[in-house]
């Protein structure tokens, strides 16, 4: 008799093969114009490869406060010629590296500081920011690290001068709330273009981001557009949804239990789940010096291993967090690739459900059933392997130690967000989040103070939205509204004082931007703008919408939870 776990594995394997059948990844070519992605030219190389020792020397010389500056610089002529000139000149007496860079490169311009009109409400400020944050890059310079896109798009702001994958979904929520459905459609079209061009959506539209993706929110983007355009949007983007799924599942057909390949893992019982992965194992061009220093701080590990784990953490969007580290105080203990993240697998469950819905809309019932079967298999795997029964919350799985991890993070809310959680478990997650993560200014990312930006005391807009939506999905409205009210109060207090919205917030109090990480606090800020607009509509009745957060808590909101949230722990 065949053991049940082997039988499940065989059936799952057949379902995956059927679902992926006929889905071809076309890694189309780059050109300086966002043209037909089926044209055949070479994939562009990132600046650390194009410029070799020159890139390394400039970054190590720390000519610019931000390592991203030179990664975004545009060569004024063929990089091979610039590199040849550099090799000829660098050992000459009086050689000035900064002068050489200034002559041979066009540096990115500092963004003009936006000064909003006086007296604007929060909503008016955000609506006024959309055109300020909008970019159009149909054509780029020949050796630019920027990748062209066919339609205009909204950037996060600050040092982030390009489009970012998972940021954009939360930005699009705000665009839709402001009535800019044309911009939503343009951004979905851009991501569809990237999938056709590169086989996946890169971290951002830069050559140095092509080796990884980010949390897969494309299905949510298409579902959002479908709210406005109906099932036509699902049918239009079904091919791109299939290609993205093929990217995440690449290599699964040949995996044996206990094996991993790039982004996909097969556990010993045959369950198929996913992890974050970057195809390269070198320092990130945009954080070159920092990555080299991190690798040098732990000589007991191969530098390439650390580099890939740093890059893979960037793919997760949580760069960086104690979630990925053995020692929260030592970044070089990061091991992202040995961790199966609960949020990633919840998002891929949503992708499988969206594929089923889109296939049904296109009239392919057989394919819809296959994707539904894959979603059901993933849901069972999440419940079996990504639930910490001892602690009472969803968590990540540790491949290295073959066990569930104990740490509670805001990622525990993702199964609720995609409606993949068992009801009794959702109640336990709500209680845990309220007891351990809820702070005066919103939901903390974790309860650990590591100095990393995706840890306490920071709270991030996308995680507030995921939590609020997920909790409401399971009737946990009191906690959902508490997260919403506290975070909005934080945003409003910061705006009242500084007249801006920022990338992240310190949720241990209200009115303070977050800290930690590799770069100063950024303002703008795309996903905060989007989530703020959506949350304003949660706290104010439709018949009387509010343009700012009320000074007193609306009576329509539930009372404050009786349990006082605990302070973040060291």
Swiss-Prot record:
The active site is at residues 319, 503. One of its GO terms (biological process) is trehalose catabolic process. It holds the Pfam family Trehalase. The keyword Hydrolase applies. Belongs to the glycosyl hydrolase 37 family. Provides the cells with the ability to utilize trehalose at high osmolarity by splitting it into glucose molecules that can subsequently be taken up by the phosphotransferase-mediated uptake system. This is Periplasmic trehalase. It comes from Salmonella paratyphi A (strain AKU_12601). The lineage of its organism: Bacteria, Pseudomonadati, Pseudomonadota, Gammaproteobacteria, Enterobacterales.
């Amino acid at each position: 008799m065949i053991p049940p776990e082997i039988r499940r594995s065989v059936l799952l394997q057949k379902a995956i093969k059927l679902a992926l059948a006929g889905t071809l990844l076309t890694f189309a070519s780059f050109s300086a114009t966002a043209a037909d992605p089926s044209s055949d030219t070479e994939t562009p190389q990132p600046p650390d490869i194009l410029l070799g020792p020159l890139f390394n020397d400039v970054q190590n010389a720390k000519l610019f406060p931000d390592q991203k500056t030179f990664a975004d610089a545009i060569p004024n002529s063929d990089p091979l010629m610039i590199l040849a000139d550099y090799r000829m000149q660098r050992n000459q007496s009086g050689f000035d590296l900064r002068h050489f860079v200034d002559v041979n490169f066009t540096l990115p311009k500092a963004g003009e500081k936006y000064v909003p009109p006086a007296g604007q409400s929060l909503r008016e400020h955000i609506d006024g920011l959309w055109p300020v944050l909008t970019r159009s890059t149909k054509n780029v310079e020949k050796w630019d690290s920027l990748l062209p896109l066919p339609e205009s798009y909204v950037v996060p702001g600050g040092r982030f001068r390009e489009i970012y994958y998972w940021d954009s979904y939360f930005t699009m929520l705000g665009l839709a709330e402001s009535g800019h459905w044309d911009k939503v459609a343009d951004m979905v079209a851009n991501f569809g273009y990237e999938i056709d061009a590169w086989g996946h959506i890169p971290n951002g539209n830069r050559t140095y981001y092509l080796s990884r993706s980010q949390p897969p929110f494309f299905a949510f983007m298409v579902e959002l557009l479908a709210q406005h355009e109906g099932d036509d949007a699902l049918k239009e983007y079904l091919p791109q949804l299939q290609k993205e799924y093929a990217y995440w599942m690449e290599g699964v057909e040949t995996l044996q239990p206990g094996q991993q390949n790039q982004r996909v893992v097969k556990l010993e019982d045959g369950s198929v789940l996913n992890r974050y992965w970057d195809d390269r194992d070198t320092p990130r061009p945009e954080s070159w010096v920092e990555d080299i220093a991190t690798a040098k701080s732990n000589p007991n590990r191969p530098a390439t291993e650390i580099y890939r784990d740093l890059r893979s953490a960037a793919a997760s969007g949580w760069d960086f967090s104690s979630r990925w580290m053995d020692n929260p105080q030592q970044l070089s203990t990061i091991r992202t690739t040995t961790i199966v993240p609960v949020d990633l697998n919840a998002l891929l469950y949503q992708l499988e459900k969206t594929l089923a819905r889109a296939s049904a809309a296109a009239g392919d019932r057989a394919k819809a059933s296959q994707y539904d079967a894959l979603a059901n298999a993933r849901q069972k795997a999440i419940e079996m392997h990504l639930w910490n029964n001892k602690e009472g919350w969803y968590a990540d799985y540790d491949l290295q130690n073959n066990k569930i991890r104990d740490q509670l993070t805001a990622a525990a809310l993702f199964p609720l967000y995609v409606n993949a959680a068992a009801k009794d478990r959702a109640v336990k997650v709500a209680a845990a989040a309220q007891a351990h993560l809820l702070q005066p200014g919103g939901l903390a990312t974790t309860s650990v103070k590591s100095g990393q930006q995706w840890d306490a005391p920071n709270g991030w807009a996308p995680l507030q939205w995921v939590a609020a939506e997920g909790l409401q999905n399971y009737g946990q409205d009191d906690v959902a509204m508490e997260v919403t009210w506290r975070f909005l109060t934080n945003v409003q207090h910061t705006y009242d004082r500084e007249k801006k919205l920022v990338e992240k917030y310190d949720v241990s109090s209200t009115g303070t931007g977050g800290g930690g990480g590799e770069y100063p606090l950024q303002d703008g800020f795309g996903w905060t703008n989007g989530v703020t607009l959506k949350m304003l509509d949660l706290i104010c009745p439709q018949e009387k919408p509010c343009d700012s957060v009320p000074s007193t808590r609306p009576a329509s909101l539930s009372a404050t939870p009786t349990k006082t949230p605990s302070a973040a722990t060291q």
